[in-house]
Regions:
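Helix-adjacent hinge/juxtasegments
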Residues: 64-105
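A structural signal for short, well-ordered beta-strand segments
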Residues: 29, 53-55, 69-71, 90-96, ...
Length: 170
C-alpha cells in the first residue's frame, strides 16, 4: 500500500489512511541507493548503506492509525575519539500514533502526529526514527577516552572545589 513518490522528502513512502484494512496493513520496504545517499547527507553520516522497515499500520481511534514495527539501518560513522570511520548496525523499534487534525486538537495524547491530506508518510517516519536513535558522540566499539589531565593528582591542574572547606576535617 505504500508507494515511492518524488518529493522534497529524501525517503517518502505515503500511505493512504482510508485504504488500511481493519486488521491492519503490513508494510515492508527498503531505501533505494539514491535515497540512502540523501539520508546520509541529512544525518551528516559518511555513508548509509541500507535502510529497511517492517511496519504494521492498524486503525486507531476515530480515523487515526497506530504504526508499530522495526527499522534496521547499516551506517558508517566517525568516532569522536579516534576520528576513524567505523560501521555499525542500528535496530529501532517503532510505535507511533497518527490522528486526523480535528481529533488531534481534542486528544489528550501529546505524542500523536497529524494525518495530512488523508495520508501519512512511512518513509519520513523511518527517517525520523533513525535520526532520533543516532548517537550524537559515536565511538568505535570498545573505544574509550583517556585524558591524562582528568586522572592527574596535580592540584595545579584542578580548579579549587567550592566544597574544599567543608570537606576538610581537623
Amino acid at each position: 500500500m505504500s508507494r515511492p513518490r518524488k518529493s522534497k522528502i529524501e525517503f517518502s513512502r505515503p500511505l493512504l489512511v482510508d485504504r488500511v484494512p481493519r486488521k491492519g496493513s503490513h508494510e515492508v520496504f527498503a531505501a533505494e541507493p539514491q535515497e540512502c545517499l540523501e539520508l546520509a547527507k541529512r544525518f551528516s553520516l559518511p555513508k548509509l548503506h541500507s535502510v529497511k522497515a517492517h511496519l504494521i499500520a492498524t486503525p486507531y481511534r476515530g480515523g487515526g492509525l497506530k504504526v508499530t514495527g522495526s527499522v534496521d539501518a547499516d551506517i558508517e560513522q566517525i568516532s569522536v575519539i579516534s576520528l576513524e570511520l567505523f560501521a555499525s548496525r542500528m535496530h529501532c523499534d517503532v510505535e507511533r500514533y497518527f490522528l486526523p487534525p480535528k481529533i488531534l486538537v481534542d486528544a489528550v495524547e501529546d505524542d500523536a502526529d497529524p494525518i495530512e491530506n488523508g495520508e501519512i508518510d512511512l518513509g519520513e517516519l523511518v527517517a525520523e526514527t533513525i535520526a532520533l536513535e543516532l548517537d550524537a558522540y559515536p565511538r568505535k566499539p570498545g573505544e574509550t577516552y583517556d585524558d591524562p589531565a582528568l586522572d592527574s593528582d596535580d592540584n595545579e591542574t584542578k580548579p579549587p572545589s567550592p566544597f574544599a572547606k567543608i570537606l576538610k576535617t581537623d
